[in-house]
A protein has these predicted regions:
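Helix-breaking motifs and short loop linkers at transmembrane-helix boundaries and internal kinks
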Residues: 24, 56, 77-82, 111, ...
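Conserved MFS/SLC helix-loop-helix module at the cytosolic interface between two early adjacent transmembrane helices
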Residues: 43-79
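Helix-to-loop junctions at the C-terminal end of transmembrane segments
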Residues: 45-56, 236-250, 334
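Helix-loop-helix hairpin linking two adjacent transmembrane segments in secondary transporters
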Residues: 119-164
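Juxtamembrane intracellular "pre-TM" segments in multi-pass secondary transporters
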Residues: 167-194
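Extracytoplasmic gate region of multi-pass secondary transporters
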Residues: 190-229, 233-234
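C-terminal transmembrane helical hairpin of 12-TM major facilitator-type secondary transporters
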Residues: 251-296
Length: 367
């Protein structure tokens, strides 16, 4: 189910140029599909713990899946870009309820402990982000509506699978308040990780959402490019990240990965008209992102003396802000200046994340 949920993030990516052409929209207008999705996802993270502690993890997962099925289907039946933007916001609400609860559920039911559960979660993220664009490209070559209906069907399958196969999990003894994630951000270690992730996500989503407009490829071709990116992300998140963490430590490896991601974005910015370089840089970035995602997710769980779901919700609330702003701003920067500029700004944002992480290193001795 997690794989399918994360497929929804990358599924729309290959069809962004198609939607722009067929609905007569500008790149920045089309990028609002990601902005509304990420903004609502981030804001909704505040309430996910409160919902889960009242109706239980299993029913929270099912509610999130139901909303994704509903709004993805509505997105496929939309007639203009404004409608799709609103439906993507509803999709983001379902996504928040699902992914915030899914990590906690995987930790509770997996047999390999927290570290093993996080690797499983990141593997699902990588597989979803690789298969999503591939499926989106194939369905998008038929119609831009295809990927929306495809997600709706797949999430309906996930809904049935969780309903049947996931055992009922007990509700937390203590009900979570909507203010608990905000209170958790008082812990400087967690706040440091969240602010770093906000800046890192700015670069991540600049790469994910604006490179389709730079490449000018068909939906199928874009699908294969991001499939390669997602496969590399999945491999490094599962097999490479744990080894690097043991060898160089969490913070040391994270500094390095952030620096490499910033350089990668800079290379894309300098070579936006060289499609071979851009494609290679996108796929290589997947490797850096995979390592970083695993390390950062693990560190967040150890950065503050609060329950894991609360730490995850607080962290996600902040970090998705970067994911919400980047797509729209990338389109605007390209319109105002040139297609090079969004990647320069993305590189600067990720580099700033290194400075934020270094400034809060004294609060991260436990990670």
């Amino acid at each position: 189910a997690c794989v399918v949920a994360f497929m929804g993030l990358g599924l729309v990516d290959p069809i962004l140029p198609v939607i722009a052409r067929q609905l007569d929209a500008t790149p920045s207008q089309v990028e609002l599909l990601f902005t509304s999705y990420m903004l609502v996802t981030g804001l909704a993270m505040i309430v996910t713990g409160a919902v889960s502690s009242r109706i239980g993890p299993k029913w929270t997962l099912l509610l999130g899946l139901f909303l994704i099925v509903l709004f993805a289907g509505l997105g496929g039946s939309a007639h203009d870009i404004g409608q799709i933007v609103w439906y993507r916001g509803g999709w983001g609400l379902g996504n928040a309820l699902f992914i915030a609860t899914a990590l906690a559920v995987i930790v509770s039911v997996a047999s390999g402990g927290t570290a093993g559960a996080i690797i499983l979660y990141e593997a699902a993220l990588g597989l979803g982000l690789s298969v999503g664009p591939l499926l989106g490209g194939e369905l998008g070559s038929i119609s831009w509506r295809g990927p929306f209906f495809g997600v709706s069907v797949l999430m309906a399958i996930g809904f049935v699978a969780i309903l049947i196969f996931l055992r009922a999990l007990p509700k937390p003894v203590k009900k979570t308040s909507v203010l608990d994630p905000l209170r958790a951000l008082r812990h400087r270690g967690l706040l440091t990780m969240a602010l770093m992730a906000l800046l890192y996500n700015f670069g991540f989503f600049t790469l994910l959402t604006f490179t389709p407009f730079v490449l000018g490829m068909t939906a199928i071709q874009l699908g294969y490019v991001y499939f390669g990116w997602g496969v590399f992300l999945a491999i490094t998140s599962v097999f490479v990240a744990p080894r690097l963490q043991r060898r160089f430590g969490t913070l040391g490896t994270t500094y390095t990965m952030l620096a490499l991601i910033a350089v990668d974005l800079l290379v894309i910015g300098l070579n936006v008209h060289n499609h071979v370089v851009v494609v290679i840089a996108i796929i290589v970035a997947g490797g850096f992102l995979g390592v970083n995602n695993t390390l950062v997710t693990t560190a967040v769980m150890q950065a503050a003396p609060v329950e894991r779901p609360i730490a995850s919700a607080a962290y996600s609330f902040v970090r998705f802000g970067g994911g919400a702003v980047a797509p729209w701003l990338a389109g605007q920067l390209a319109a105002w200046f040139s297609p090079h500029v969004p990647f320069y700004v993305g590189a600067a944002a990720v580099a700033s994340g290194i400075a934020v992480l270094y400034s809060g290193r004294h609060f991260l001795r436990t990670v």
